[in-house]
């Protein structure tokens, strides 16, 4: 039967999606299912790994039922996932020994503090391109092994398996036959040397993690195994693409050349700049990461992670009850000509790149008696654009590359006010992708390359299309005046301490 489709499984922090793409990269069908978030203690975030798989299976079933396609027409499956989230399971039974510890969770902060105090920061940064932070997988693995009875003994005997969510999904889809990850996900674990391309023995020793639990690291586009599950009506479909969600979005945005960058505006903001075959070491608070491994070559990226972006709109809606729907925020922002001197620094869980200060908290500056709800909403939206400029400035300094345009996706950038202000404050065109699901599209592209569904990146570039281009309209003096106010607000926030 002719292969007409690629299936992408997009496993995110709050939901899983199954999306079917055709040869032109168009969405044929989509299904989504949320799952339960677990908060055992303040600052801890966990998932039940079985709930994750149930959500994946449910979306696959719903998608196939809704589209009524012949499963045999699916050329391959691409998987993209919430990065860093950690699962450890029993190889024999396939049962997790503890909940998945989510990337957002801060429950390993004490371990990170101990490692930093012990002087490991420079070694970790040199090998991994990352910082010692509870964000990454390595300390989560250590925490589980330390807190589950007999886990260290079982791990040393090779009875346990570790994986990020891509690994967990593939293990289950292949009936426990395949234990793999790709370069992009491995590079986020704090255990992988992104230069030597290996699980690093010094890092494993530092965290007391046996190598026996680790998955094989493979390229981001190859056939890893075949499905062994009834959800595809007995058909064995190649699983052929893997990438962490932000790297997948970079690929889906067709950012294939050094200097090209994308920004995803979700709960947080994740900006990646392609740096080619060179791993650029950041001197300005960014992360160096593997973008993907393809055709025997590794390509790298610089990444800036912003913890609070679109969720500032949720805060305005749910916490402060300033409007009923998130989409209303644009109308409020448009009712005033400027921010009235108000700056919102949304450091609700600290500040990410390029500051990396988990101890600071959110603040508002510039309030006067004439400040209105509209000024407040506008200032909150503007905070996303200012934080993006913080990251871009660091990227351009590190990579010595001047950005020509910024490709964007995510719910928050569908706000036209936000998109225009972002272009104004960066002084570069902001291109909003026609397809919002660029993360899933990137995973589909990787699987399609491995199965021959697509022939080349050039073919994919032809499919990429703009929903709208926003060009800078603000003069330099005003732009720099506004940004100077933001920098002043951030400095004041960094200096404030809760008694």
From Swiss-Prot:
Sn-glycerol 3-phosphate binds at residues 13, 83-84, 135, 245. It holds the Pfam family FGGY_C. It comes from the Bacteria. GO terms for cellular component: cytosol. Pathway: Polyol metabolism; glycerol degradation via glycerol kinase pathway; sn-glycerol 3-phosphate from glycerol: step 1/1. Transmembrane segments: none annotated. Its EC number is 2.7.1.30. It is an enzyme of class 2 (transferase). Gene3D superfamilies: 3.30.420.40. GO terms for biological process: glycerol catabolic process; glycerol metabolic process; glycerol-3-phosphate metabolic process. Glycerol binds at residues 83-84, 135, 245-246. NCBIfam families: glycerol_kin, PRK00047.1. Belongs to the FGGY kinase family. This is Glycerol kinase. It comes from Xylella fastidiosa (strain Temecula1 / ATCC 700964). The lineage of its organism: Bacteria, Pseudomonadati, Pseudomonadota, Gammaproteobacteria, Lysobacterales. The gene is glpK.
């Amino acid at each position: 039967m002719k292969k007409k489709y690629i299936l992408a499984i997009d496993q995110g922090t709050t939901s899983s999606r199954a999306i079917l793409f055709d040869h032109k990269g168009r969405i044929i069908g989509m299904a989504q299912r949320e799952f339960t978030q677990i908060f055992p203690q303040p600052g801890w975030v966990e998932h039940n790994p079985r709930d994750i798989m149930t959500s994946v299976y449910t979306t696959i079933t719903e998608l196939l039922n809704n589209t009524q396609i012949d499963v045999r027409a699916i050329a391959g499956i691409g998987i993209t996932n919430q990065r860093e989230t950690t699962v450890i399971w029993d190889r024999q039974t396939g049962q997790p020994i503890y909940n998945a510890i989510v990337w957002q969770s801060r429950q390993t902060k004490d371990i990170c503090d101990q490692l930093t105090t012990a002087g490991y920061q420079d070694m970790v940064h040199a090998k991994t391109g990352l910082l010692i932070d509870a964000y990454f997988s390595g300390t989560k693995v250590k925490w589980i092994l330390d807190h589950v009875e007999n886990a260290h003994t079982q791990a040393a005997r090779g009875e346990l398996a570790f994986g990020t969510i891509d690994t967990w999904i593939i293990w289950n889809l292949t009936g426990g036959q395949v234990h793999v990850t790709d370069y992009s996900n491995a590079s986020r674990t704090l255990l992988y040397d992104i230069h030597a391309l290996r699980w690093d023995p010094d890092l494993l020793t530092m965290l007391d993690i046996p190598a026996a639990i680790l998955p094989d690291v493979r390229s981001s586009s190859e056939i890893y195994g075949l499905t062994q599950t009834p959800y595809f009506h007995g058909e064995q479909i190649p699983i052929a693409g893997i990438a962490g969600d932000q790297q997948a979005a970079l690929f889906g945005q067709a950012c294939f050349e050094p200097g090209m960058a994308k920004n995803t505006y979700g709960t947080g903001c994740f900006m990646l700049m392609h740096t080619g075959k060179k791993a650029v070491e950041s001197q300005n608070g960014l992360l160096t990461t593997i973008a993907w491994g393809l055709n025997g070559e590794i390509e790298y990226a610089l990444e800036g992670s912003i913890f609070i972006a679109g969720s500032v709109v949720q805060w305005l809606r749910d916490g402060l009850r300033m409007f009923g729907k998130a989409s209303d925020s644009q109308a409020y922002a448009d009712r005033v000509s400027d921010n009235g001197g108000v700056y919102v620094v949304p450091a609700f869980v600290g500040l990410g790149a390029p500051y990396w200060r988990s101890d600071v908290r959110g603040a508002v500056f510039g309030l006067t008696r004439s400040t209105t709800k509209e000024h407040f909403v506008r200032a909150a939206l503007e905070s996303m654009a200012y934080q993006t400029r913080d990251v871009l400035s660091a990227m351009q300094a590190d990579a010595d590359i001047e950005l020509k345009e910024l490709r964007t996706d995510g719910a928050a950038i569908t706000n036209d006010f936000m998109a225009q202000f972002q272009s104004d404050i960066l002084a570069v065109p902001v291109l909003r992708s026609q397809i919002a699901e660029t993360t899933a599209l990137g995973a589909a592209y990787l699987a399609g390359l491995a199965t021959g569904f697509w022939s080349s990146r050039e073919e994919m570039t032809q499919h990429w299309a703009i929903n709208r281009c926003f060009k800078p309209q603000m003069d330099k003096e005003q732009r720099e005046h506004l940004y100077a106010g933001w920098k002043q607000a951030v400095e004041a926030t960094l200096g404030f301490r809760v008694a």
